[in-house]
Amino acid sequence: MRVRAISDRDYLNMIRVSRRQAPASLWIKGASVLNVYTKEWQEHHVVVAGERIAYVGEKEPLVDDQTVIMEAAGQYLVPGYIEPHAHPFQWYNPYTLADFALQTGTTGMVSDSLMLMHLPFSQRAAIMDSLAAHPVKQFFWGRLDPQTGKAHPSFTKENLARMLEHPRVIQGGELTNWGGVLQEDETLLFGLKHTRDLGKRMEGHHPGASYETLNIAAAAGVTACHEAIHAEDLLSRIRLGMYATLRHSSIRPDLPELVKGWLALGVPWSSRMMLTSDGSTPPMHRDGFMNSTIRVAIEAGMPPEEAYVMATLNPAVYYGLDAEIGGIAPGRIADMLLLPAIDQPTPSIVIANGQRVAEKGTLLVPTVQPQWDEASVRLADPLKKQAHPDWFRLRPDEDGKAPVLQMLNAVITRLSLEDMPVDQDGYVSLHHDPQLALIATIDATGGKRTLAVLRGFGEQLEGLASTYSASGDWIVIGRDPQAMAQALERIREIKGGVVLIDEGKIICECPLPLAGKFTSAPMEEVISMGENLVNQLRSKGHVHLDPIYSILFFTATHLPYARLTATGIVDIKSGQIVVPALPLP
């Protein structure tokens, strides 16, 4: 399929430029060009006609006074990078992320649509279609389940089909509801099969999966998985016909060990491997985007040529786009990067659609401006009452036990029922252990709250509130009910975001006014905002990899072992509510 349309006139002109019968629009002269098809560097001229490459070789093109000539001797030319697995709503949004990615050499992205699924389909489609005009080629995947444990009208058979059939949607997934597959959920299996019936790819989500489980996933239609933790996991996926994506994200910085482990296995690098930054939260993007991922791979011992191929040709082939993008060859869209050295993947110049669009990390062209006022992204606040400290007090059960969520790492939580001291009013007291806090999820629509003691998030944390959560429920964490209520009221005032209270004062405020989960602010501002929150939480003793992801995933029902939901604390393995939600007082 065409990634960008080409007119009959431009098509004929491209052929004429290739034959040296018409002048080139752009001539990149004398660069060392990476041939991703053979993994060799060649000193060639690259000749562009409009948006597309017309010629790659040793002969000089026909030029006129309109031809832009780039003297590139001593520089290295590679295709624009492709991010095959983006999550573009981690406080930032698809527009600001694309602008940022373009500055550092990413010219293609395949992105998650989960945060769009609460919108009417017409609005969802309008956003995806508007992004087609961005210099970064943007496609999406269609989610098959809401990842909340709650039914949602966007996830009926009819609505799944409508999303999957959209031309900007080129895969299904990622498949987070594996239990639904094993239980033969009719709607989920329809989505899996319909994705493959359409000839589209299907992304899995199988961390720690056995070879037997991966067999079932492949049989069900999964064609790739980004959840390999060890080199052997990569090999298992490839042996079963999947593509294996090597990940380096803020929550799973696995790439160095994957590379070293693969080298230790002594097997050749595979054309069925890709690289991803997998939706890192803003602070990690201080180091860049796909350029940073490639650099990590090279520093870990991956040959540069292999790293560039995994970030260009391989994802293009996987998604059936390699006749259009992913390589420097005639007929392809002219997305190319000039690098100062082979092992330095941050480009000095970015070319997209045949034009110089960024130089030294600065955008040179206007991109696409979102129309958020035309989308239903205002945070809903159906609460009819002011937050009260009593919402954040927990009584033990009749056996004197209280639910305790233990953070095993940044995203995995295990539930236990423990004896806890109580205060004079019979509420759980946390004064004996500074590492404890209370965590509450507020179901604003249903007027309910789910409460537990939280161990491992930090020390002496008075009050934090967040509308940024996987389920859309509001999360409040702290040791001081007054500060917790204050933080919750503040995020309602700013129409969404994350607020941290200490000694009665706001010490960190991160406004996320779009659906309470993201902002239209530019990436640099979002990165600084995220760094401030992380630094504040580190000062409060948070030791896990990524506290922003920790907050997001407290309500994500695709992760073990216990999660907070609108109906109570759920045991993920059994699907049973083990601690029911309570009404708001």
Task: Give the location of each predicted region.
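Active-site microenvironment of metallo-dependent hydrolases
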Residues: 1-44, 49, 54, 100-107, ...
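Divalent-metal coordination cores built from histidine and acidic residues
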Residues: 2-18, 22, 72, 98-201, ...
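Active-site metal-binding motif and surrounding structural segment of the metallo-beta-lactamase
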Residues: 61-77
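Di-metal (Zn2+ and/or Mg2+/Mn2+) metal-binding site signature of metallo-dependent hydrolases
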Residues: 75-97
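Residue-level marker for buried hydrophobic side chains located in beta-strands
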Residues: 80-82, 140, 275, 477
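Active-site beta-loop-alpha junctions enriched in small/polar residues
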Residues: 87, 114-116, 141-148, 174-178, ...
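Histidine/acidic residue-rich metal-binding segments in metalloenzymes
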Residues: 155-173, 180-244, 253-275, 285-299, ...
